[in-house]
């Protein structure tokens, strides 16, 4: 036995080594370096990570809504081993585990952190395990894992081994409770550090812990340390075997320093001088053997070589980009700057010690490249703070002026010319509306800068508005129009025409927030220039202005006035009255301070506060709640009897929230009751710091996540909101305006879905009581605020988790214990399990005693048995019993704690009689019989082996003798017999005649290629074809099924049915050669032609996938016209009429199974071979067959019978698909709801803008009784007048095969006609699961306005439909 155990251990070690080495990505291969990645909105965007081995920057995966777990299947990025900054995961739905996505991510450097953290997992609602089992080093920063309600395996990871430097600052809270997690680590994951503990990422992956001698760096699978220059592991002992390098990597080798003639780049790799970025927009510096973006402190760019840095002599020149100084914070951006590359514009209205602050921040500026403008700086008295200014180059000027001073009410002095010498290279001076600035002060500057005084005009320097205190008279300026939106106001006013047009310098638009009306233009100002008014200058040639960046639902005061020359005639100025306007409403921010508590086992009470920014009149709130499903199968794997169970505390009641229950902080007063002890100052300070830090982190997260998109003109999203998507999370809300404001207790809405997301609307209240909930269950709660204006939408969700209280009697064992069997020294007992326990039963306690014994019943230690073991053995067996009477009782234990003990049950164990009975024939076995049985069994075994070898040989090499199977179009390959075989025939094509050109996409059995076939078509030496393949890993049965489904088309010869060109069945891989349909399938064709202006459709994942298809390059982007739709409908009906004439029932007619040729002719094709590509269009029955329920007729859904008339129903759905450009039928309904809806007589609604005549044809196809539906020939007859003339030449309807057929009238068809072939897909009693339909676009018709509503088609309705 020990030998066997030892061999098993060696095999396991070897397997671990192979797997480890197979997953390892050695760095000595070619690196594929990617920049920072921000992946959001769609799962498909993850493919940007393909081939990346190192991300030099951060990786953010966030805000992916409406995704399911299966959407991530097939996605894996094993090449990625290193991230140099941080890794952020935030609100990604459907993602449960990272082990498959990033199996080899080993290092997160943390060069730049996300708010002090290198790894952040925040509000990942579906995440169950982190699973980064290769992660070995976080070299800088900490870990923050918070608010992940399903995340387990956190206590089985020792982060001190991974993030040693930031371990003390790790923040891991508000995830799934430990006692609710399985957290099962295999025995090989047990280490001693310093105490014995199990460390693993999941049940199949241990945490890698290296010996102390290796300094956290060891090899995978075998013992041994990595080279000292490695981090993240290695696959060998040298510096070339590292997964990642601790210092620098160069040519696949990890080094402490870069070699000569190379430069350190981004602190991780060595590059040559040529590789250091050197472009027009980015000139990196070569300094001290580093390639860096800017010169370090104390150095400046070399004048002769911009690639080098030279040490400064004295004050180091510092170049800065120009900009506006409108506050002290803005001035601080120029601290230390000596050269301004651009303009220096100062417009500062006030502040404490403003001159000192400006001198400290702007006092070193020596040169300005463009111009200096001092505009409306009411707090300035002098410009002496620009004490070092020596040169204004005037490369770009403000309307021709290099020094521009306008409207500075308190400016009295310019510069101290005894210490200042300013040169202006180009441009003039401009001084206007500086009432305290004397003219001689201005002329002094004119002289100092070297401008001739005679070159100065009144247009440049006003003789009347500088140094004067004169009041100007104003004419009335009329505001003609005010338009508002949620964040801007558009003003239009009457044109002002002074006697001399040159007198008008500009208009000034002023605005400010105000709650009241009746203010004047001087309100909000003081003598120091502090003002609440904001102003904009507008060109004198314009009489309109757009004020942007405003707050929604806010009242603003508006004023327009003119600036004219002071020397102009009386009445040359004008201003308007102050008018008021309110911006439009917008969606509010999410509700604040959501608190959920439970006061009973079936109730949750939710309270919240209004949004910080209601942005309108918040009238109601939508509260959504859904019970969190528990993975019972996984949770039962934990051995609760060994580890013990800490009862889970449900969500607190209101009293618990208000009062602190911790006993050490309580004291007793005179009446014996407890009161809360006051907290110490240190405790209060720590709580305040933690709360402030938490708020600061979440603000940082939201401000960095919800950033404004590039090229986006609308206002950026408000922070702390969920993103707005094309399909709002609250799109199915129901607003009941008659609901009383006092009705706050709302029971959950009944629904067939066993665990739906429910919602209720709360009007004019900030609390709701949810009743009828399941006891001791965790619910995810979302509270959404909505304004009265439904058009602006609702807020993002405020999300909380809460658990109802336990039901005290739910864990009690119902009924009595049954003694199933008593045998020798054992008794098998069975008892019924609790019907509806608190969460789930984890184990049972069993107490038994022999009656008459002297030990006390209550003092006996109970036995413990896990629930899953009890279920597996159908009871519990007590062994090692001696004869006598016994008494036993049981109790169940759930996550809520122990249930009540059951009643006593007694049983009797008889004394065993061990003496043999010579008269018992069962105890007498003849030796001859035993020998005969052994020989017979050996012979049977030999015969079975011989038969197995013969059968496998026949299956593998006996293809020539295998008969053909039955051929028919199968939606469900699982239902085909495994005996179906394929025999090569005249359709066989030599493999060498087929040439593959490029991939077109993935098919049901394998890849589909575009190719060329030689000498396959008569008189055509080379033709383009589509080649379907079967995967090399496919089984023999799958290859035969692949060939048999292709064989269906061998008997077809119709222009509107895809033609089979040949089959290559000999050798591997198996090929099926088809007619090339250059524009792909009709579903993607329609989606590629959706108009771009349909925002929510053209941006959908399905539309993007269709537009990125290989077929798109053969296509144009114009949507099909109504005439095109009718033409497509006609040719599809013609192809189906041919199949009906051949007694062939398609059973899966849909746009996905129709193909489009280069000339846009549509043909019936594929016959069941596309179901894997569009798996979301199918519905799996009982884990087996895939059914296209959204295209199936009522009789097919009810009894599983398919005829050509059921194909006509599917044809009507195809017409609906074409009218909506391939929207999904029955959107918003689950597959089970669709099944019931159709069986009950429901049909698809008319798409918006769809012509009545086309919808009438759809309804004809959707007649409930199949005998009332038209045949495909009748449909062609109806449509033929609208079809192109070429149709008559190629159609089956006009062919000799159909010649002489009398048009089939509807009344000629028997009600229960069995003329067509009937096939039964599934038994009538089949059960259907309630899998919801996948998210899809809102149905629409692209034909709005393109034709009269009544259409131009003369639709002839068959006689029988008139009844």
Swiss-Prot record:
Protein localization: Membrane
Q: Which Gene3D superfamilies match?
A: Hormone Receptor, Insulin-like Growth Factor Receptor 1, Chain A, domain 2, Immunoglobulins, Phosphorylase Kinase, domain 1, Receptor L-domain, Transferase(Phosphotransferase) domain 1
- Catalysis performed (reactions): L-tyrosyl-[protein] + ATP = O-phospho-L-tyrosyl-[protein] + ADP + H(+)
EC number(s) recorded for this UniProt protein = 2.7.10.1
Tell me the residue ranges located in the Cytoplasmic compartment per UniProt.
950-1363
* Similarity annotation: Belongs to the protein kinase superfamily. Tyr protein kinase family. Insulin receptor subfamily.
Q: Name the PANTHER family for this protein.
A: INSULIN-LIKE RECEPTOR, TYROSINE-PROTEIN KINASE RECEPTOR
Mostly located where?
membrane
User: Where along the chain is composition biased (Polar residues)?
Assistant: 1343-1353
Q: Name one GO cellular component term.
A: axon
Going by the UniProt record, its keywords in alphabetical order are:
ATP-binding, Cleavage on pair of basic residues, Disulfide bond, Glycoprotein, Kinase, Manganese, Membrane, Metal-binding, Nucleotide-binding, Phosphoprotein, Receptor, Repeat, Signal, Transferase, Transmembrane, Transmembrane helix, Tyrosine-protein kinase
Transmembrane ranges, per UniProt, are 929-949
SUPFAM superfamilies attached to this UniProt entry: Fibronectin type III (SSF49265), Growth factor receptor domain (SSF57184), L domain-like (SSF52058), Protein kinase-like (PK-like) (SSF56112)
What is a single molecular function from GO for this protein? metal ion binding
Q: Which organism is it from?
A: Branchiostoma lanceolatum (Common lancelet)
Q: What is this protein called?
A: Insulin-like peptide receptor
Entry keyword Amino-acid biosynthesis: no
